[in-house]
Amino acid sequence: MKKVRITAIRKTCYPDLMEKYENPIQHACEVEEGQVWVANGWCKPEGFCDSAWDSISPFVMTLAHGGGDFYDGWMKNPKSAMISCNDGFRPVSFYLEALDEDAE
């Protein structure tokens, strides 16, 4: 099993949707663009958002176990994926890439 690098590539915010539909929340997404985590195989990195992990974990698991080439050639690098979290008000796009380093 391999380690997988997770990089926050883009964070978007839709204030109009938040104003119209969302109840105010105390601790909204604190992810910053450029932030990097490394998943030790299938394990969620410490401090990584639980909700975002629910969205990306199937792809992390596949990459960690040597899989890839999602959706028949979707990504230029077959050992990678670009996956967004499921927050419709402030989605974050994460670039996932399998590393050559073995998980511990």
Regions found by a protein language model. Name each.
Residues 58-104:
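Short, compact, well-ordered microdomains
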Residues 44-55:
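Short, Lys/Arg- and Gly-enriched loop/turn segments at beta-strand edges
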Residues 2, 8-22:
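Short, structured beta-strand/loop micro-motifs enriched in basic residues and often containing a Trp
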Residues 1-3, 30-33, 101-103:
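A short, structured loop/turn motif at beta-sheet edges
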Residues 17, 51-52, 59:
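Catalytic cores and adjacent flexible loops of soluble metabolic enzymes
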Residues 20-44:
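Short, flexible N-terminal segments of the mature chain
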Residues 13-19, 46, 102-104:
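Short, surface-exposed beta-strand/loop "edge" segments at domain boundaries and coil↔beta transitions
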Residues 3, 36-38, 91-93:
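Intrinsic-disorder/low-complexity, polar/charged segments enriched in Ser/Thr/Lys/Arg/Asp/Glu/Gln
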